[in-house]
Each structure stands twice: as structure tokens, then as C-alpha cells.
From Swiss-Prot:
Lineage: Eukaryota, Viridiplantae, Streptophyta, Embryophyta, Tracheophyta
Family, as annotated: Belongs to the protease inhibitor I3 (leguminous Kunitz-type inhibitor) family.
UniProt keyword list: Protease inhibitor, Serine protease inhibitor
Tissue expression from the record: Cortex of potato tuber.
Function according to Swiss-Prot or TrEMBL: Potent inhibitor of animal pancreatic trypsin (serine protease).
Name under which the protein is recorded: Serine protease inhibitor 8
Gene3D superfamilies tied to this protein: 2.80.10.50
Source organism, top-level taxon: Eukaryota
Organism expressing this protein natively: Solanum tuberosum
Length: 42
């Protein structure tokens, strides 16, 4: 579900923007389309 607050991800879930060092982990789904958490990339 694309939104202005969601970075562009590749198929592995890693952000394509090299300036960012965070990955987005989708946790289940909520009424608004899902709960999203930010976590530091390993």
C-alpha cells in the first residue's frame, strides 16, 4: 500500500535509497491497511 510516508522498497524489503539505514517491517494488518514499524537494518 503506497503512501507518502512509505519509502520505496525492493523485493527483499530493503530500501532502495542508500541514504537511509532503516527497513520497514510490516506487522499484520489493521483496519487502515496494516501496522508498520521502523527498525534499524542489520
Amino acid at each position: 500500500l503506497p503512501s507518502d510516508a512509505t519509502p520505496v522498497l525492493d523485493v527483499t524489503g530493503k530500501e532502495l535509497d542508500p541514504r537511509l539505514s532503516y527497513r520497514i517491517i510490516s506487522i499484520g494488518r489493521x483496519a487502515l491497511g496494516g501496522x508498520v514499524y521502523l527498525g534499524k537494518s542489520p
